[in-house]
């Protein structure tokens, strides 16, 4: 058996650090704080020396996990002859934590001098305080002392019952009698921050105490209690100020500082886990509870509440009373957020179109009336100009993963949406982290599933590529769609780790992303599948090379390239290239000036990278700050996260590969060596980590995932070899669905097609079509539809046209020279010329065309062709075909797209009613006539139909469309191999299943 790595089965567990939510019985009674709020939580307590509080705030200078920690900085002035009894206490109130063997109390501390000590206040409720008989007796328990200077170190109380047992004789001696310790509990965690004369700075993070009794969670110190008077006099800190949120020139500004949104839609993942993943914004549904909202604000999140959109009265009569009621409901909804200053913007919904604009406009007007001035945001599909006049932030999104939309086309789509957005409007996009409903229903076959027992996608690598493309498109915010698919219930540990790593990188790159002057420019590189986005800011450049190879949306390739070369134009003088990762920042050596710019060589490219050209090399400059940041703050975590992710990826890939083999997939001879290479890199990563070499540990963990991707990609490529395109089989769109694909393929391969049951799929008319084409309705059951916004200057037309002149040119015979001019070597004809099937066209075929409408500017001059269309959709629908549920069918059609489709990332789309648009055949251009096949199973509804659609400027032709039922003709011979006990195809067909294919008939269609 191939060796695997053990992994925990907790709910959302990241063993690499405090990205953990423990699924224990008393999980709800563990009190945690990551100190990610806006005001300090620790309260200044008593002291026996004079000191001054220099700083006390939530700080982003150092943090063990989340972006912030709490900083306490004091300057102590002890008297002469001081002993070790001096103290300056800061305390943190907690719900009562009863003393028991299970009680644990600890906190992480970092300082530049040793001596900070953890303590706790113990309450003995059965005893009275002699100096205050109305209060219970309290005493201090002493825990660990900080020693590991400049590094984060956990301080713990240790065995609390043992501490109490040892302390009882002291209390007995002090009181002169025995003490009853029953029902004792801890109610305060205390830090003695005195570490000697002078300045002491202490950063505090990741407090955890439990089990505790259910109770209220402490508020920040400014609102919890008035600090105790001490040696420094009264507390004169001003009350916390309300933060100002403004959107200026497409940027979010908070108190005048630029802010990059890293958000997520919240469902049920603990907010602490999301904060530890370095997210800073949470999108809440309309029914979010006030307690959850308050908890998010306390965790330091910015909040984006979802508000209902008001109805608009129709033309049939006054409905002002209905609108007034809706406005009152909206006002009531807004009051839920009146007590917090953490609202970043109001969300007015998603997937809106131009037709929804009047209702959104009315809602904005009501928001103005009730004087809620926070910016407004909306996610739209089209109607950019209208929404841009009323909305401060516009989001766009689509789900490219597991569909036929290649990621280089998704890149184009992002750029087109950005170009349609009005200038000075903040933009963001949602990144797909989940499986869409269609995938869960069709591929997995578990509608409404709340848990998945086997590995599922998306791959972390896919999320990384989508995020980099979103950054390159110029978005000032990233939203991750689903927090639920980050949980262990959804096999999401590796995705959660990827989000944490990505957000750590983005936090480092944020100054360059927010100061970009112009949209990114895309460059080619030395590898055709790698494109590099160049983002320019003042005196600096950010270069983002990204792997965009075919099929990445299905299953990522290895995407590892040695010595990738990029020529970057217009690099500022004295700027040096640096490779930036969350575990280290290193200079790229060997760059040189060449014609066209500066050529850099990336020794080890892996899927995506961030390269910064800068001359800011001062001691307090950007590079030094980044190096300190990775060395002392995030590098250790990044290395841990990357190694844990590699282990998770290894185990998921191994399990799925074994299931593929059991389902009849081919053995891969290189499997053993690939898995061995992955294990070796994981082991080396652990060794580097133990030696505190964070950068090397991170790199090895990343290297470990490359052979895993090679294995997954090889399995996927074997599966799709017989297909015209991957989504022709609904189970070939993901590596994790391949076991089902091989079962499906066996059934298809053992079938024979019957006659087509689709009427008029040859598009033949009883008479010759007119020059402009005959109407689609000339064929019974066939229909056409279109949806074109008036903003799109195009004209769409579909019809049945004469096929004369549309046949492919016959290949010209080669002239064979003889004699002295005869070539020494004769080039064999290409497989396309020899094996390419050719259609036998009838008299007519289907034509779809969208062409630009002649338009003029105000000066009467013709405008150019549109570069992006908001919504231009021309479609022809076939008749509905009824078949018994469960019937396998083969769909085939011939298509000819003479020129690339312009102004649309989708091009020509052909899909069936079973697989839908995600599983469509997308065509941008063909070399002559080309045949396409799709294989589907009839659903319970018992019918299927086809749609031929054009989404951009261009022309497409179709002919010989068939829907052929497949009947079982041959039962594959079953044999067992080894000890697997799984049915296998005969050896000659085990590596490539022979799908039944359409063969053109010499007698014509």
What feature does the model see in each segment?
Residues 57-86, 792, 799-808, 813-816, ...:
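Short carbohydrate-recognition loop motifs
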Residues 179-185, 194-211, 217-219, 949-968:
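Extracellular carbohydrate recognition
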Residues 527, 538-683, 687, 700, ...:
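C-terminal beta-sandwich/jelly-roll accessory domains of carbohydrate-active enzymes
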Residues 131-183, 913-943, 953, 957:
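Extracellular carbohydrate recognition and processing domains
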Residues 24-54, 215-234, 716-830, 967-1005:
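Extracellular carbohydrate-recognition regions
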Residues 33-36, 89-122, 156-157, 206-208, ...:
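Extra-cytoplasmic beta-strand recognition segments
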Residues 109, 196-199, 206, 211-545, ...:
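Glycan-processing catalytic domains of CAZymes
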Residues 74-104, 128-144, 744-745, 825-829, ...:
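Secreted extracellular polysaccharide-interacting domains
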């Amino acid at each position: 058996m191939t060796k695997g790595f053990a992994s925990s089965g907790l709910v959302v567990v990241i063993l690499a650090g405090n990205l953990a939510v423990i699924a224990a019985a008393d999980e709800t009674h563990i009190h945690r704080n990551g100190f990610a709020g806006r005001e300090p939580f620790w309260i200044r307590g008593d002291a026996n020396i004079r000191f001054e509080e220099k700083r006390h705030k939530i700080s982003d200078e150092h943090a063990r996990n989340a972006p912030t920690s709490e900083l306490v900085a004091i300057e102590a002035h002890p008297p002469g002859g001081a002993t070790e009894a001096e103290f300056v206490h800061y305390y943190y109130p907690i719900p009562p934590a009863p003393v028991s063997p299970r009680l644990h109390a600890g906190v992480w501390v970092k300082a530049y001098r040793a001596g900070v000590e953890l303590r706790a206040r113990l309450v003995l409720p059965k005893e009275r305080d002699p100096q205050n008989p109305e209060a219970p007796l309290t005493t201090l328990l002493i825990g660990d002392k900080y020693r590991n200077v400049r590094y984060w170190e956990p301080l713990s109380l240790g065995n609390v019952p043992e501490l109490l047992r040892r302390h009882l004789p002291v209390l007995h001696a002090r009181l002169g009698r025995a003490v009853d310790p029953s029902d004792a509990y801890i109610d305060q965690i205390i830090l003695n921050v005195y570490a000697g004369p002078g300045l002491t700075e202490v950063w505090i993070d990741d407090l955890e105490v439990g089990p505790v009794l259910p109770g209220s969670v402490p508020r920040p110190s400014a609102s919890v209690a008035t600090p105790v008077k001490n040696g420094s006099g009264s507390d004169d800190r001003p009350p916390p100020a309300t933060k100002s949120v403004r959107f200026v020139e497409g940027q979010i500004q908070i108190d005048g500082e630029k802010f990059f949104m890293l958000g997520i839609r919240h469902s049920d993942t603990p907010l602490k886990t999301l904060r530890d993943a370095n997210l800073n914004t949470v999108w809440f549904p309309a029914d979010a509870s006030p307690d959850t909202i308050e908890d998010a604000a306390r965790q330091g999140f910015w909040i984006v509440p979802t508000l209902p959109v008001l109805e608009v009265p129709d033309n049939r009569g006054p409905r002002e009373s209905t609108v007034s009621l809706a406005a009152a409901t909206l006002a009531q909804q807004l009051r839920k957020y009146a007590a917090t200053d953490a609202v970043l913007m109001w969300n007015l919904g998603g997937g809106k179109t131009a037709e929804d604009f009047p209702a959104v406009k009315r809602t904005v007007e009501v928001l103005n009336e009730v004087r809620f001035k926070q910016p407004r945001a909306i996610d739209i599909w089209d109607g950019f100009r209208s929404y841009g006049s009323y909305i401060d932030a516009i989001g766009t999104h689509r789900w490219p993963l597991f569909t036929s939309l290649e990621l280089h086309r998704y890149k184009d789509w992002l750029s087109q949406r950005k170009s349609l957005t009005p200038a000075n409007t903040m933009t963001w996009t949602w990144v797909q982290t989940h499986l869409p409903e269609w995938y869960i229903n069709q591929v997995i076959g578990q509608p409404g599933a709340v848990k998945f027992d086997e590995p599922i996608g998306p791959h972390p690598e896919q999320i990384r590529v989508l995020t980099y493309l979103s950054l390159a498109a110029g978005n000032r915010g990233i939203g991750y769609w689903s927090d639920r698919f980050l949980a262990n219930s959804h096999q999401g540990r590796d995705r959660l780790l990827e989000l944490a790593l990505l957000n750590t990188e983005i936090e480092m790159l944020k100054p360059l992303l927010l100061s970009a002057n112009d949209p990114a420019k895309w460059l080619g590189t030395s590898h055709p599948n790698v494109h590099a986005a160049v983002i320019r800011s003042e005196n600096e450049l950010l270069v983002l090379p990204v792997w965009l190879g075919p099929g990445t949306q299905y299953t990522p390739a290895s995407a590892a390239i040695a010595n990738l070369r990029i020529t970057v134009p217009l690099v500022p003088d004295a700027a040096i290239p640096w490779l930036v990762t969350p575990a280290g920042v290193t200079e790229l050596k060997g760059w040189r000036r060449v014609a066209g710019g500066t050529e850099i060589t990336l020794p080890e490219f892996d899927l995506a990278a961030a390269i910064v050209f800068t001359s800011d090399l001062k001691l307090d400059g950007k590079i030094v700050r980044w190096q300190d940041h990775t060395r002392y703050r995030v590098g250790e975590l990044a290395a841990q996260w990357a190694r844990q992710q590699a282990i998770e990826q290894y185990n998921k890939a191994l399990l799925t590969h074994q299931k593929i083999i059991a389902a009849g997939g081919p053995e891969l001879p290189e499997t053993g060596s690939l898995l061995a290479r992955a294990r070796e890199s994981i082991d080396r990563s652990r060794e580097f980590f133990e030696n505190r070499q964070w950068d090397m540990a991170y790199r090895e963990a990343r290297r470990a995932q490359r052979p895993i991707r090679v294995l997954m990609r090889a399995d996927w490529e074997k599966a799709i070899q017989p297909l015209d395109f991957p989504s022709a089989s609904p189970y070939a769109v993901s590596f994790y669905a391949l076991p089902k694909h091989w079962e499906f393929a066996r059934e298809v391969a053992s079938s024979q097609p019957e006659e087509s049951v689709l009427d008029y799929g040859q598009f033949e008319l009883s008479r010759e079509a007119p020059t402009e084409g005959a109407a689609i309705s000339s064929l019974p059951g066939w229909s056409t539809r279109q949806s074109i916004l008036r903003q799109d200057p195009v004209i769409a037309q579909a019809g049945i046209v004469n096929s004369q002149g549309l046949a492919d040119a016959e290949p010209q015979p080669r002239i064979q020279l003889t004699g002295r001019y005869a070539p020494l070597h004769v080039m064999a004809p290409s497989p396309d010329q020899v094996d390419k099937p050719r259609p036998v066209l009838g008299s007519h075929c289907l034509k779809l065309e969208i062409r630009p409408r002649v338009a003029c500017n105000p000066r009467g001059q013709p405008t150019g062709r549109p570069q992006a269309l908001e919504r231009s959709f021309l479609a022809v629908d076939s008749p509905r075909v009824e078949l018994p549920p469960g019937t396998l069918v083969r769909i085939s059609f011939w298509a000819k797209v003479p020129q690339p489709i312009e102004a649309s990332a989708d091009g020509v789309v052909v899909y069936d009613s079973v697989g839908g648009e995600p599983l469509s055949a997308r065509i941008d251009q063909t070399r002559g006539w080309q045949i396409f096949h799709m294989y589907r199973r009839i659903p319970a509804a018992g019918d299927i139909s086809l749609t031929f659609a054009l989404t951009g400027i261009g022309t497409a032709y179709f002919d010989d469309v068939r829907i052929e039922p497949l009947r079982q003709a041959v039962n594959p011979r079953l044999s067992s191999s080894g000890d697997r006990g799984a049915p296998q195809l005969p050896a000659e067909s085990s590596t490539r299943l022979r799908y039944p294919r359409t063969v053109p008939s010499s007698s014509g269609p």
